[in-house]
Amino acid sequence: MSEMTQTAEEQPIDELVGWVKQHDFSLNLPPERLAFLIAIAVLSNERFDEELGEGELHDAFTIVTRLFEDTGEASAFRANNAINELVKQKLISRFTSEITDGASIYRLSPLAIGISDYYLRHRQFSKLKLSIQLSMVADEMAKAIEAAQKGGTPGHWRRNVYGVLKYSVGEIFDQIDLNQRVMDEQQQTVKQQIADLLNKDWREAINNCESLLSETSATLKELQDTLQAAGDELQTQILDIQEIVYGDDELEFVGETLFGLQMKLDRITSWGQQAIDLWIGYDRHVHKFIRTAIDMDKNRAFSQRLRQSVTDYFDAPWLLTYADAEKLTDLRDEALVLRDDEVMGQAPIDVEYEEFEQVNDLLSERIGDMLKAHKQQGAPIDLGLVLRDYLAAHPRTHHFDLARIVVDQAVRLGYSESDYQAIQPDWQAINDFGAKVQANVINKY
């Protein structure tokens, strides 16, 4: 989510709705109008001052109308109407000055630039683009770490650390997030292509579907590897800066920015694996659909096409690929014999679960009583100390389950103010075997 969207979220909804109503904002962009806007954007980029005259807009409208023949002729009247519509929707701005002898000049608005940029610059998602963006983020993070290690006044931190993190690193993260959303759209496009293929010739459809599925799977795997490698480095850099600013109240604004970047980084890195998992499920669905369609082909249309392919082999040669699986040997008894022997085995699952629940409830009640003493006395709960003292009286094999129950009961009693201030707690040892816990002191009940 971009910084602009986050700022807008802080305002009341009714205030934002009133703002839209007051300025009469609206958008209506049929395909020909969108094409006209993109044509204006392309022509504008070719100009040094990014300004266009009315004649150039008429030329762009003529090009668009030539491709959209059903919309009508490219008359000056229709061109002026199209221009006025874009001006009314605040997509282009019209200026008139004496320098141009009263002729109007036009310039794209920020809204139009955003729309045209989406269709022109973000149409293609590539591993190279992602790699460059991740490299840029790493360079900016390195600058921030260097400035943080030097230290200085709050002004130095705000200018050389906070500014770089918020406006350089944060914006690049937003661009990466946008590119990932473009990749999501491309996956939907591939799915539509596969659906169209399955409605056509079966033999060609199977080959093309396999190609599309494999190509997209390989792309997602490469992207995930790239994200994983870069994500580990970025995570380390964020933790390094957090360690420097930890405990300094004057640098709390830097810690809050790092917390926001951490959330963005987690979302970016988790996208890759999630996209792969979803695509694997879709891949299996397509193959299952093809097998089911062949099995349920009542008219034997696929079989008929296969026989026809064999008949026409010499005119249209093809290759046949098959798999020869090894036979499985069945080692079960051919006949089952009833036996009167005593049954030996484990307790049923229901009984085991019931016994575990009884033990768990007793422990939870006992631990809850222990922690309530802190609440009654108004004393804070330092989970690190509480766990260490409590686990010391129990066998090592029980430490994991007991620690889980203690934490669960503690968070039911209260919370820590530090959690809402994005303060990262230190790791504390809770036993002599290397187990650690990271939790703020609970001081609100």
Curated annotation (Swiss-Prot):
CDD domains in the record: MukF_C, MukF_N
This protein's GO CC annotations: cytoplasm; nucleoid
Cell cycle in keyword set: yes
Subcellular location as annotated: Cytoplasm, Nucleoid
Region feature (Leucine-zipper): 213-241
Xref: SUPFAM superfamilies: MukF C-terminal domain-like, Winged helix' DNA-binding domain
GO biological process, one term: chromosome condensation
Keyword annotations from UniProtKB, A to Z: Calcium, Cell cycle, Cell division, Chromosome partition, Cytoplasm, DNA condensation
Stored Pfam families: KicB, MukF_C, MukF_M
GO molecular function terms noted in the UniProt entry: calcium ion binding
Oligomeric and partner information: Interacts, and probably forms a ternary complex, with MukE and MukB via its C-terminal region. The complex formation is stimulated by calcium or magnesium. It is required for an interaction between MukE and MukB.
Role played: Involved in chromosome condensation, segregation and cell cycle progression. May participate in facilitating chromosome segregation by condensation DNA from both sides of a centrally located replisome during cell division. Not required for mini-F plasmid partitioning. Probably acts via its interaction with MukB and MukE. Overexpression results in anucleate cells. It has a calcium binding activity.
Family (UniProt): Belongs to the MukF family.
Protein name: Chromosome partition protein MukF
Organism of provenance: Vibrio atlanticus (strain LGP32)
